[in-house]
Amino acid sequence: MKINILTLFPEMFDIFKHSIIGRARENGFLHIETVNIRDYTLNKHKKVDDYPYGGGAGMVMTPQPIVDAIKAVKEKNKGKVIFLGPRGKTFNQEMAKELSKEEELIFVCGHYEGIDQRIYKYFDLEISLGDFVLTGGEMACIPVIDSISRLVPGVLGSEESFQDESYYDGTLEYPQYTRPFEFEGEKVPEVLISGHHENIRKWRRKESLLITKERRPDMFEKIKLSKEDIKLLKSK
């Protein structure tokens, strides 16, 4: 997958040079490039923002630099243009799955008080992280790209790595334990050291369902429970 990020702060995405995403880039599974919107401004002072018509606090990003940057990237990349902003659809795992199937994606990060309304017609999709305010689109773009990237084949090395994670199948993940067996008087559940893989699978599924029911009843209501799920929930 190829990802282009249009931003005023390319250095903020250096985080993708490290860890799993960094290795995926080195191995050719991901190609991430940043484009500095400021490089496309025609203003001799390199300004990319101006005062809003009608008055108001803050500055608004002007249309020319962003639109020209989008057009330049689109000449070589045919991916969807995605804007990170409060009006967008709330991002979730299902959206991450769908976007991970794309070969190319183009992200546009806004800043200041927002962007000129005339830019919006260039976006194929608008995404929001939720009902809260961030300093800029970069802050939202990083977790969105990370979530999408880890679903791209080859990035995690094994599909099983993300299939057991929270949200993948509509449930929260089951509890995890590691050494030592006993810590501050609390022991690891016996089933996890039994070596009985089927019992371990059932325990994990039951715990996942119970945690989801308790912590996220809104998610639990959407789960299509199997006969086994119902039996597990009724068991002691």
Swiss-Prot record:
Q: Does the keyword tRNA processing apply?
A: yes
Looking up InterPro entries in the UniProt record yields: Alpha/beta_knot_MTases, tRNA_m1G_MeTrfase_C_sf, tRNA_m1G_MeTrfase_TrmD, tRNA_m1G_MTases_N, tRNA_MeTrfase_TRMD/TRM10
Keyword list (alphabetical) reads: Cytoplasm, Methyltransferase, S-adenosyl-L-methionine, Transferase, tRNA processing
Q: Quick one: where is this thing mainly located?
A: cytoplasm
Keyword Cytoplasm attributed: yes
Q: What is one cellular component GO term in this UniProt entry?
A: cytosol
Which PANTHER family is this protein grouped with? TRNA (GUANINE-N(1)-)-METHYLTRANSFERASE
Q: Which residues bind S-adenosyl-L-methionine?
A: 110, 129-134
**Protein name per its UniProtKB record:** tRNA (guanine-N(1)-)-methyltransferase
**Protein localization:** Cytoplasm
Q: Provide the family line.
A: Belongs to the RNA methyltransferase TrmD family.
Q: Which gene encodes it?
A: trmD
> Entry's Pfam families?
tRNA_m1G_MT
This enzyme's EC code(s)? 2.1.1.228
The GO terms describing molecular function are:
tRNA (guanine(37)-N1)-methyltransferase activity
Listed GO biological process terms: tRNA N1-guanine methylation
CDD domains in UniProt:
TrmD-like (cd18080)
